[in-house]
């Protein structure tokens, strides 16, 4: 299953979206923590 498959584009896109979502949550958490601790 190491061959490139165009059908995997949806899975790659959703996984990238998940990573972006986690990154956004992490950034928001850092901003909120710095805001509350200031």
UniProtKB/Swiss-Prot annotation:
<comment type="subunit">
    <text>PSII is composed of 1 copy each of membrane proteins PsbA, PsbB, PsbC, PsbD, PsbE, PsbF, PsbH, PsbI, PsbJ, PsbK, PsbL, PsbM, PsbT, PsbX, PsbY, PsbZ, Psb30/Ycf12, at least 3 peripheral proteins of the oxygen-evolving complex and a large number of cofactors. It forms dimeric complexes.</text>
</comment>
<dbReference type="InterPro" id="IPR003372">
    <property type="entry name" value="PSII_PsbL"/>
</dbReference>
<keyword id="KW-1133">Transmembrane helix</keyword>
<keyword id="KW-0674">Reaction center</keyword>
<keyword id="KW-0150">Chloroplast</keyword>
<keyword id="KW-0812">Transmembrane</keyword>
<dbReference type="Pfam" id="PF02419">
    <property type="entry name" value="PsbL"/>
</dbReference>
<comment type="similarity">
    <text>Belongs to the PsbL family.</text>
</comment>
<dbReference type="GO" id="GO:0015979">
    <property type="term" value="P:photosynthesis"/>
</dbReference>
<keyword id="KW-0793">Thylakoid</keyword>
<keyword id="KW-0472">Membrane</keyword>
<comment type="function">
    <text>One of the components of the core complex of photosystem II (PSII). PSII is a light-driven water:plastoquinone oxidoreductase that uses light energy to abstract electrons from H(2)O, generating O(2) and a proton gradient subsequently used for ATP formation. It consists of a core antenna complex that captures photons, and an electron transfer chain that converts photonic excitation into a charge separation. This subunit is found at the monomer-monomer interface and is required for correct PSII assembly and/or dimerization.</text>
</comment>
<feature type="transmembrane region" description="Helical">
    <location>
        <begin position="17"/>
        <end position="37"/>
    </location>
</feature>
<keyword id="KW-0934">Plastid</keyword>
<dbReference type="GO" id="GO:0009539">
    <property type="term" value="C:photosystem II reaction center"/>
</dbReference>
<dbReference type="GO" id="GO:0009535">
    <property type="term" value="C:chloroplast thylakoid membrane"/>
</dbReference>
<dbReference type="InterPro" id="IPR037266">
    <property type="entry name" value="PSII_PsbL_sf"/>
</dbReference>
<protein>
    <recommendedName>
        <fullName>Photosystem II reaction center protein L</fullName>
    </recommendedName>
</protein>
<keyword id="KW-0602">Photosynthesis</keyword>
<keyword id="KW-0604">Photosystem II</keyword>
